[in-house]
Amino acid sequence: MTTCVKDHACLFGDVEQGEMILNEYGHVVTKCWYDLTNHYAGITIDAFIVMPNHMHCIIVINNDVGAGLNNTVGAGFKPAPTDKRHGLSEIVRAFKTFSSRYINQIRNTLGMPVWQRNYYEHVIRTEKELQSIREYIVNNPIQWELDVENPQNMKDVGAGLKPASTKLKNA
């Protein structure tokens, strides 16, 4: 999954000599990403990188969450909230909400958007593909000078041009 900062603003830090140096906002994003496992049962945080104006990540959603629950419980009783199945869009929406709230508290800009509305997702189907994407994520700071999300490489920042191989989702 990839999600970008509103207007591609470089909000989370800088890449220096091929290494991502997070600022305070970048650390907030990292903390909020890790905290998702405290709010959603059955998810695992895999590789991720917070870049100056976007984030790449792999999140594993266990589709068996909630399996085996007795969904015919008595009137007024419901399975525990942590047993509920959660889709990627709900998880991304929560992450963006949590991180935006904290960042806006720090910079005293309550209610201002931090993230673009959408995100890019890709379902990983093979171990080979998983390894390739992990390498891409780890090497992203090294490739920053060539990155399509680097504002210096964008011809039409306002047009929201993206690689054709990604799938846009709302969050």
Language model segments and positions:
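Short catalytic/metal-binding and nucleic-acid-binding patches
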Residues: T2-A171
